[in-house]
């Protein structure tokens, strides 16, 4: 993965990556990506204004290596591996190469503007200076590769240190997520056990209610013939009384 224009470095040489570039290479829904982006601590996320070739400035979010790891490790893929390894290393190497080249240009400009005599001068006073200057140039040329290697080694050491911190933070995040998952799993197991106990209690209550209903229906069924006979007797007595009253009224 080659360095792109989707990165920037601050004054402390911290690498910041454009979140749009990360989103375009991840297979993640936009809403989930935005929610995950705003869970990153503010010190690992910054907002900048980007003209983008339009007449109105737009807001762009940048994340450092920690924030990029939080975004890409949710969906592991080849892009995540390259982003957290070769992409960061190549951008740091190009960054330090540009810094070294700009420093060499500034040194060459300062030398060209210096008021000392040039080597082409034939004055005898300038010859010793030219010799000392040539010696200093040869020394600077011999020391510049060493200085460049040292800067590269320092950059790689800084990248290694940041990667170690990144892996430690990611491992801590994974540990916290694992603990939260275990807590949620234990809570779900407790709720499931409570549901099982509740269903068992409901089954027992249903059986008791059905048994009592069956007993009550049997008692009602058994008592119905006695009530029928009693009603028949009462009806006969009522008819006899009515007939007696009618006969009494007729004779009178």
UniProtKB/Swiss-Prot annotation:
Ranges of compositional bias, category Basic residues: 104-150
One MF annotation (Gene Ontology) recorded for this entry: structural molecule activity
Protein's UniProt keywords contain Phosphoprotein: yes
Chloroplast among keywords: no
Region (Disordered): 104-151
Keyword field: Host cytoplasm, Host nucleus, Membrane, Phosphoprotein, Viral envelope protein, Viral occlusion body, Virion
InterPro entries assigned to the protein according to its UniProt record, in alphabetical order: Baculo_PEP_C, Baculo_PEP_N
Gene Ontology CC: one annotated term: viral capsid
Membership in a protein family: Belongs to the baculoviridae PE family.
Entry function: Major component of the polyhedra envelope.
Protein name: Polyhedral envelope-associated phosphoprotein
Organism: Autographa californica nuclear polyhedrosis virus
